[in-house]
Each structure stands twice: as C-alpha cells, then as structure tokens.
Amino acid sequence: MANVVVIGAQWGDEGKGKITDLLSRSADVVVRYQGGVNAGHTIVVEDKVLKLHLIPSGILYPETICLIGSGTVVDPKVMLKEIEMLIENDIDISGLQLASTAHVTMPYHRLIDQAMEKRRGEQKIGTTGRGIGPTYADKAQRNGIRVIDLLDEQKLRERLRIPLAEKNNVLQKIYKELPLDQEKVIEEYLEYGDRLRPHVVDCSRAIHQAARNRKNILFEGAQGTLLDLDHGTYPFVTSSNPVSGGACIGAGVGPTLIDRVIGVAKAYTTRVGEGPFPTELEGSLNDQLCDRGGEYGTTTGRRRRCGWFDGVIGKYAVEVNGLDCIAITKLDVLDELEEIKVCVAYQLDGQKIEYFPSSAEDFSRCKPIFKSLPGWKSSTAECKRLEDLPPSAMAYLRFLAELMEVPIAIVSLGASRDQTIVVEDPIHGPKRALLNI
C-alpha cells in the first residue's frame, strides 16, 4: 500500500490531470482535496477529449473510488453537468463520492466574485469569476452552505435565510445588482441535492476505511504551489491550499497517512491571470510556446502567459511540498527551439538571490538570471524510453533535476497516455530515489 499526493509545482495548468490519470491505474481511491470549478484538467482517452473541473481524473477507471473531499467547494450545477457528460461517454460513475461537509458555491457567490473583480479595475487579481473566493470566505466566516444542507429542506431554509438576505443587501446597495429570489434558490438547490444524494458520503471515514483495507490512495491537488493562499504570490493566488499539506486538511487525514509526494511541472512555465512572472516571454517566442503547447485555460479559455522554466520557484515547490520526485510535462513543446533558457537565480535591487521572495512587490522587481542550454531540434513525441530522447533533451532534464535537487519520475511528451516515459513508479518507488539518466 502507498498513499501519494500529486501537486502542481508552478502556477497551475502543469498537466496534473494526465499524471493523475496515469497514476490512477495503480490507485484504489482518488481524492480531490481543495479548489472548485476554477480548476480544470483535460484528459485524452483514445479519440475522446474530456474536460473536467470537479470530478477527479480517476473516474475513467471503473474500479476506482473518486472522492471530492471536504476541502473543496462544489458548484452542484457544474458537477451534475460533468456527470451527464461522463454518462454520455459511457463512463461508469458508480465510484463517484462527494463529501457531505464540502461547501457549496451559491449563485450569490458568483455574482459577488464577478462584481468585486470588475470594481477592482486595474488592481484586478485575475479571478475566474466562478465564486470560489466568496465561497471560501463564507466558509471561514461560518456562514456557508454545505452539501449536507442540500439534503434537508428545513435545514437549507434555516441556513440560507440570513446569508441570502445579507448577500442581496450587498448586491443591491454596493454593486447595484438585482437581488436573488429566495424561493427560486431553495427550489433549485434542493433539486441539486436530490440528484447528488446517492454520491454523498462522510469523506474522512471513507478514506480511513480504505486505508484500513490497505488500499492505494491518491490525493489530487488543483491549481499549483505558487497559487497557494499562504505560500503563493499573494494576493494573486487562489483561496485554498494546493500544497501537499492541504491534502491532510481537505481530506481529513493525518500526515502520517501520506507516503510520497509527487510534483508536476511543465518543461517551461505558464501563468493565467494577473501577478508577477519573472521569466515571462513576449513576442514570437511566447506565441510559439502558447500555440505548440495549446496554452488556453480549461476553465476560462484565457490565453496563458508563457515563459522559460523557473528553477527558483521549482526549488521552492520542492521545499514547501516535501517533493519526493517530479513529473516534467510538455517536453515536446520545446522540440523546435535552437536554445532553451532556465532561470537559476534572480537579481533583486542589484543583489543576486536564489530564493522566492515572500512579497509580491519584491517578486515583481526580480529579474531572471538565465542559464542557456542547447535545444535538440528534433521530435520527442514518439520516444518511449529515456534512451530514445535526443542527448540535448536528456541533458536538459538532468539539469532541471540537479537544479531542483529532486529526481524526475515521469516525462510527458504529449497529451495521450502512451506519450509518457515512466522513469520510476511514483506510487511504489522509494522516497527520494536517485535520478539515473
């Protein structure tokens, strides 16, 4: 038995969906532990392209239990649409489970999220407008609605009475929006509750039962380390904790249940929305990476900002998450480049630093110090073993591993499952295994 956490080591969109899908073959339970519909992952199975926001990637395996944990915030309308999409594609959803204590994104959360972002003007933070921040805010203020509340009309009415009145007041008086009709909201969300009822479980109890039965458990994070509420580029962050420690809180388990932590990072760097990005590229090279990498958000469709691999934030992700190994994705996107650069340090106000500044203002002033490496100018998409890669591609991977001081366990060379080189099984491999490439 081995229990593994998969996290994003950059600003999200690293390809966690594909890696989780790959690892789900060895997992009995897959747990999504934080985030909401602001995340998105794309899975390619044969000729099918499936885009999911809430439901874990492991749903493609009929024997796997897929659990949406207590640390997530759930938009039931979106979740039900995903269920319908999966059923239409003949995918068995009998293993899908939803934590009774997960908080629910209500219609006023979305309206307030969008209105707040519009009001910020030039100081916008780049929210997806899906209501995630306001949902987590209500949770922290003990004013939220949970999944279990949708299963009981009297409880929902009682729980919703004061929050809805307060939100309507805010919508009308501050944002000049129309108020929501309480009866319509109650009717709509009771229907969602009825449809989701068969999937609702006690999250922590379900996970501990699986652990007692010596099942392999995979904890799937959303977004990425640099978007973490406490450890990211605040305030340009998400409203939850994507780092590995968030798995314990969001799933209701102790840290001793976790055996290994695997990070996922692209062979370059991307970011969606606002916030500092030291290695960001401009012009034709940015366009080339964006087009070859298909860098458009699963959730918003927004074009991602592209840049060179940042080894400073890579090392930071290794430390903050306690990574045992890392998966490098989209190596093939670099196939046509003559020269590839990697950020090895920053210059901040004339001083060389090799750490991630805690202040977003300081981070925005950081200038990257690059190491240039030769490109390989040949396709890697069909390589099946490390030995098949061009020597310069091997050297690039070795450089990243040595820079971050973490072994590379997986190399992804495209969207399909078979475009993957597994160096070391992250679920059953030893902790901090040596890289041998």
Curated annotation (Swiss-Prot):
The keyword Nucleus does not apply. Its EC number is 6.3.4.4. Keywords: Cytoplasm, GTP-binding, Ligase, Magnesium, Metal-binding, Nucleotide-binding, Purine biosynthesis. SUPFAM superfamilies: P-loop containing nucleoside triphosphate hydrolases. It is an enzyme of class 6 (ligase). Pathway: Purine metabolism; AMP biosynthesis via de novo pathway; AMP from IMP: step 1/2. It is found in: Cytoplasm. One of its GO terms (molecular function) is GTP binding. Its main location: cytoplasm. Homodimer. This is Adenylosuccinate synthetase. The lineage of its organism: Bacteria, Bacillati, Cyanobacteriota, Cyanophyceae, Synechococcales.
